[in-house]
Amino acid sequence: PYAEPGQQSSYTATLGGKTYGISIHRQADQSLPVVTDELGKKFYDNRVDVVITCDNAEFFKKSYTKEAFAGFLTASAEAEGTVLLGMAFDSEKSDGHAIRLGAQIGQVGVGEGPAFTIEIPLDGGVSSIVRDNNQDTTGNDMTD
């Protein structure tokens, strides 16, 4: 199977008067089920590790796989033959209440698929995942 190259991103954000460091590391994970696309090509799925520090102390740490988003994948085409493509800090949607990360599920090399927002409350509350229909790039967007 093909493994996408690892990807490391780091961001700094000042929110609510505090400084947050956000580290996002994507890597192929051979312990996850192998994904086969519609052409029969096999891929290792990705794991994304997120670590957030606040004033240099660890604030949030979690690993994500496609399984975390499975309940939001509405069509079998969204779930089969796709991997967790990656995540990024969303500075426009983050504010004094929450850090928000964008995530995308899709086919390797295509860069299209359902998009999600991961919300991490700054008060230490439970993180949540929401499907982001505005950023969705599945190609079924309706236009007026």
Predicted regions mapped to residue ranges:
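Surface-exposed acidic loop/strand-edge motifs in secreted or periplasmic proteins
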Residues: 2-86
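A short, polar/proline- and glycine-enriched secondary-structure boundary/capping micro-motif
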Residues: 34, 71-73, 111-113, 138-144
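Short, surface-exposed coil-to-beta transition loops
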Residues: 45-47, 111-116
